[in-house]
């Protein structure tokens, strides 16, 4: 199971990310749980150590996503962080807090899919297809082991 947090003050953007996660889970048969936080303070008050991946907006009311990432890193240096922003100028700052990547708003599913797959690879949760080679009278066949 993958645990993901979305830290985003814009409800429409958060709902979009949640729908993308649901779609990704169905397409890839990934069991996951996602929690949405509307601001950085609420996120930091939660047990951030339970999350594998965090999608965090940079521009948040009160504490910025960058500040929240710095605080989060103190207790959870291994969490995978992907920033969400509408300003590319913040991208370079994200690497100061070891962000894996960033997604530009408005978020589109292909970009989400690519970033989420990258994050899951680091989590070790990508599906690695195992094949079986079967020799029969008709020849040699390669089959997905899950189908046998």
What does each model-identified segment do?
Residues 1-5:
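Non-catalytic signal-transmission and effector/linker regions of two-component phosphorelay proteins
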Residues 8:
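Conserved acidic carboxylate
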Residues 11-15, 91:
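Charged phosphotransfer/docking patches of two-component systems
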Residues 16-21:
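Short hydrophobic helical patches associated with two-component signaling proteins
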Residues 25-34, 79:
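A generic structural motif
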Residues 35-42, 65:
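Helix N-cap/capping motif at the beta->alpha junctions
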Residues 45, 51-126:
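CheY-like receiver
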Residues 113-148:
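Conserved binding/recognition cores within well-folded domains
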């Amino acid at each position: 199971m993958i645990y993901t947090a979305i830290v985003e003050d814009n409800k429409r953007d958060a709902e979009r990310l949640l729908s993308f996660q649901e779609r990704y889970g169905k397409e890839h048969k990934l069991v996951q749980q996602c929690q949405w936080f509307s601001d950085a303070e609420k996120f930091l008050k939660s047990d951030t150590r339970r999350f594998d991946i965090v999608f965090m907006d940079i521009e948040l009311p009160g504490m910025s996503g960058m500040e929240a990432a710095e605080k989060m890193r103190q207790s959870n240096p291994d969490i995978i962080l992907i920033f969400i922003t509408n300003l590319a100028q913040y991208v370079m700052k994200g690497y100061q807090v070891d962000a894996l990547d960033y997604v530009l708003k408005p978020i589109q599913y292909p970009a989400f899919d690519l970033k989420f797959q990258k994050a899951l690879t680091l989590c070790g949760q990508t599906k690695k297809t195992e094949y079986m080679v079967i020799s029969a009278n008709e020849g040699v066949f390669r089959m997905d082991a899950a189908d046998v």
